[in-house]
Amino acid sequence: MPEQLTNVITLARHADAAPFRRLVEEHGSPLLVLDCDAMRRKYRELRAALPTVGLFYAIKSLPHPDALATLAAEGASFDVATSGELDLLRGIGVDAAATIHTHPIKRERDIRDALDFGCKIFVVDNIDELAKFEAFGAQARLLLRVSFRGKGVVSDLSRKFGCEPGAVPWLLTDAARIGVPVIGLSFHVGSQWPDPAAHVAAV
């Protein structure tokens, strides 16, 4: 038996392996199988658990058009970071009002592409990024990303992204000076954190 088929059998009970074997025979291995029904169920579970929270799917985690279309049909919003990701959303007809741009470093072209698409909300965490929005004024709305250092997190993104809390007043003052509205704060507690209380502590 070919090695890739042996690997498939180790991932599922023998009785359930037949469809995976056929997929590997047809498409080769390694192979990512996307179950849109499972995505739909998980999204609904999360929405039911957090009924008052807007849920934004980070496209970079799995930028497959079928995944995006499945979530869009469920009413999900989207976290975009590149013009290419905006093109994916444009291709499936996503409402631009359901998007937020979170890339920490943006070129003027990136900002313009997002605004042309209709994405109005951006995340910034330093004075240099803030200055890039002076040319766009009130066309854009900003969230200030604050550094939140959590103990025990596997991937601590606040080591390199986010301003110190003490810098927030300075950034607010400068945003007001250049006429760009700040509508809130943003933070990332990190990934692969087994304790849900970490999110509570961050809030």
Where do the language-model regions lie?
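Active-site loop/helix belt of alpha/beta enzymes
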Residues: 148-203
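ATP-grasp fold ATP-binding core
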Residues: 141-147
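A charged N-terminal "starter" segment
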Residues: 1-135, 139, 172-173, 177-182, ...
